[in-house]
């Protein structure tokens, strides 16, 4: 985001603490510091390039953790006391709109809202405590809050995070999640990668892929309509799965995937 956009959101929300990823984001906040006098602290995560910054306004994430540990030693019951004092009606998340038709606005979500959302989703499509979920989207997006916070609290599954943004695809293969949630552009990007690899493969491989893909589409139609597949199609799909779909899922990290959610925009029928 540009500094004026950041200034607007901080003024709009009245935030007193800001979490910045790295030096680049910290510098943006310095540009608008005079416009955000209510911000008491800026907490930065990546310490690269921050050695020369000597300002009590700034705190490294490591410093925050150490302060928390020290506070815990002095006040061992502080967290439990705060939990008992908390109310389901308290605001826990400000969800920003996209701002495509004007300046962004913030929807005020309470603890009750998020937990109810998680419970409702569990009733419709239950997830298991033994499931692994891969979280690689911004937590500022309400869709990721829904999965990584609300659904994780109500379903009890493990939330995994990539080591770095650049290693997300490799981490996906290593984790092999049971559940994923992504906007259409992510699924479309994965589909494009598959298409590129197929288009660069030998002609015979492309022929096999196209033939077996048709079998997969036919099987998917029966599954989506909840109808049993004819015997011939079941056999053809089993063969297609062994030859193409299962190895492909393994390469993508989808071998254990049971739930692939999407939201935020329309998903193309081909995907």
Task: Identify what each model region corresponds to.
Residues 58-59, 63, 69-96, 103, ...:
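Conserved pre-ATP/AMP-binding loop-to-beta segment of ANL
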Residues 137-141, 264-266:
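Conserved AMP-binding
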Residues 1-31, 117-134, 165-179, 251-253:
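Conserved ATP-dependent adenylate/AMP-binding module captured primarily in the ANL superfamily
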């Amino acid at each position: 985001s540009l500094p004026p956009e950041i200034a607007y959101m901080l003024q709009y929300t009245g935030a007193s603490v800001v979490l910045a990823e790295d030096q680049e984001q910290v510098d943006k906040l310095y540009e608008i510091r005079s416009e955000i006098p209510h911000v008491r602290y800026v907490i930065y995560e990546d310490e690269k390039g921050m050695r020369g910054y000597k300002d009590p306004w700034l705190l490294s994430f490591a410093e925050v953790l150490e302060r928390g540990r020290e506070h815990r030693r002095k006040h061992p019951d502080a967290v439990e006391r705060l939990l008992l004092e908390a109310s389901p009606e308290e605001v826990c998340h400000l969800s920003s709109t996209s701002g495509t038709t004007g300046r962004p606005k913030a929807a005020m979500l309470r603890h009750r809202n998020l937990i109810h959302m998680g419970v409702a989703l569990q009733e419709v499509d239950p997830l298991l405590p033994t499931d692994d979920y891969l979280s690689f989207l911004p937590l500022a997006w309400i869709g990721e809050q829904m999965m990584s916070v609300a659904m994780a609290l109500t379903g009890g599954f493990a939330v995994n995070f990539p080591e770095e943004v650049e290693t997300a695809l490799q981490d996906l293969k290593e984790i092999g999640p049971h559940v994923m949630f992504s906007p259409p552009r992510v699924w479309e990007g994965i589909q494009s990668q598959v298409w590129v690899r197929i288009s660069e493969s030998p002609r015979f491989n492309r022929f096999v892929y196209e033939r077996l893909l048709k079998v997969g589409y036919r099987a998917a139609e029966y599954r989506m309509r909840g109808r049993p597949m004819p015997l011939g199609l079941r056999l053809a799909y089993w063969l297609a799965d062994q030859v193409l779909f299962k190895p492909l899922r393994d390469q993508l990290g989808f071998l254990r995937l049971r739930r692939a959610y999407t939201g935020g925009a329309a998903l193309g029928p081909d995907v």
